[in-house]
């Protein structure tokens, strides 16, 4: 099955191209971003060699729907979706931190807790907690934003002391983070899911804070099924979840955790297909709609055409308004 792992277009008025872990980001003019959600998959801050069919479409369309459903909380960068794998929006100056919020003790937080750590980003964790247990209140554990390599945990105090974010702006980011997580929790609950943890990225434009990048996708979030959560928790069983964690678990079974000297294992085509179906399952569960699979015939040409058509139409509207 076809998938798209990289692009290298040259659009009119394009000024910059950046290849992220899973997204290709084009700057057009001085105030517009064209972001293509590719089918690349990363774990432990390493991009794996094979792409996952439909993953980019799943991420892009989930993020777009959640951007629309949270726009009353704060403005966001999105302007249009000219293609199932593309969002075009405002260019904002990103804050140099990512806001991670956790409702449950799981994933990397649990691994550190199990090793005896009781503070995370200067947040004190209760004693006696078990894996996948709900925190009394969601905790915010920010990370530095690494364009290459590993993101690093950082405390609120360090962020302010290092002038990464002003105290006033950081407190606003905390407020938005909790409000977005509450909204995401409510939407997930209505679909029989638990929003376990997630991350948000913010930026500034003309003095206003905007929500940027993806939101509540399986790459940025972790979901449990709520139906049998309590039973599994009481039995000490692993939770059935919809997230990238199952890919991380697979990698760890292959003795890979992104550490220096470790060899990245290659996923088989069969396993890639399993991962693809898990992503589609999450889309249909959290969105509550059937996933319409876009054609995988010449994906790159389709995307290029759709973006160029949007940019041309936007330029025509701009020209007409000037006349």
From Swiss-Prot:
GO cellular component terms, semicolon-separated: cytoplasm
Pathway: Purine metabolism; IMP biosynthesis via de novo pathway; 5-amino-1-(5-phospho-D-ribosyl)imidazole-4-carboxamide from 5-amino-1-(5-phospho-D-ribosyl)imidazole-4-carboxylate: step 1/2
One of the protein's GO biological processes: 'de novo' IMP biosynthetic process
SUPFAM superfamilies linked: SAICAR synthase-like (SSF56104)
Sequence similarity: Belongs to the SAICAR synthetase family.
Source organism per UniProt: Azobacteroides pseudotrichonymphae genomovar. CFP2
Protein name per Swiss-Prot or TrEMBL: Phosphoribosylaminoimidazole-succinocarboxamide synthase
Keywords for this protein: ATP-binding, Ligase, Nucleotide-binding, Purine biosynthesis
InterPro entries, A to Z: SAICAR_synt/ADE2_N, SAICAR_synthetase_CS
Pfam families hit by this protein: SAICAR_synt
Annotated catalysed reactions: 5-amino-1-(5-phospho-D-ribosyl)imidazole-4-carboxylate + L-aspartate + ATP = (2S)-2-[5-amino-1-(5-phospho-beta-D-ribosyl)imidazole-4-carboxamido]succinate + ADP + phosphate + 2 H(+)
UniProt-listed PANTHER family: PHOSPHORIBOSYLAMINOIMIDAZOLE-SUCCINOCARBOXAMIDE SYNTHASE
Molecular function in Gene Ontology: ATP binding; phosphoribosylaminoimidazolesuccinocarboxamide synthase activity
E.C. number(s) listed in UniProt: 6.3.2.6
């Amino acid at each position: 099955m076809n998938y798209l792992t990289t692009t290298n277009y040259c659009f009119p008025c394009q000024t910059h191209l950046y290849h992220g872990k899973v997204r290709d980001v084009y700057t057009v003019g001085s105030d517009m971003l064209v972001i293509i959600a590719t089918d690349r998959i990363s774990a432990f801050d390493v991009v794996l060699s094979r792409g996952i069919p439909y993953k980019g479409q799943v991420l892009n369309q989930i993020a777009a729907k959640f951007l629309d459903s949270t726009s009353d909380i704060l403005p966001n960068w999105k302007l249009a979706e000219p293609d199932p794998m593309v969002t075009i929006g405002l260019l904002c100056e990103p804050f140099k931190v990512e806001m991670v919020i956790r409702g449950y003790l799981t994933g990397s937080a649990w691994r550190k807790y199990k090793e005896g750590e009781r503070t995370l980003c200067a947040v004190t964790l209760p004693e006696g907690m078990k894996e996948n247990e709900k925190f009394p209140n969601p905790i915010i554990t920010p990370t530095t934003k690494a364009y290459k390599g590993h993101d690093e945990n950082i405390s609120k105090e360090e962020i302010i002391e290092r002038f990464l974010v002003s105290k006033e702006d950081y407190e606003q980011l905390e407020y938005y983070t909790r409000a977005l997580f509450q909204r995401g929790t409510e939407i997930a609950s209505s679909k029989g899911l638990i929003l376990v943890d997630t991350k948000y990225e913010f930026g500034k434009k003309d003095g206003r804070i905007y929500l940027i990048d993806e939101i509540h996708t399986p790459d940025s979030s972790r979901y449990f099924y709520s139906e049998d959560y309590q039973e599994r928790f009481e039995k000490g069983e692993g939770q059935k979840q919809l997230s990238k964690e199952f890919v991380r678990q697979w990698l760890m079974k292959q003795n890979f955790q992104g550490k220096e000297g470790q060899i990245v294992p290659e996923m088989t085509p069969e396993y890639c297909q399993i991962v693809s179906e898990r992503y589609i399952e999450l889309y249909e569960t959290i969105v509550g709609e059937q996933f319409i699979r876009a054609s995988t015939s010449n994906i790159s040409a389709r995307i290029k055409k759709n973006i160029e058509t949007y940019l041309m139409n936007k330029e025509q509207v701009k020209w007409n308004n000037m006349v």
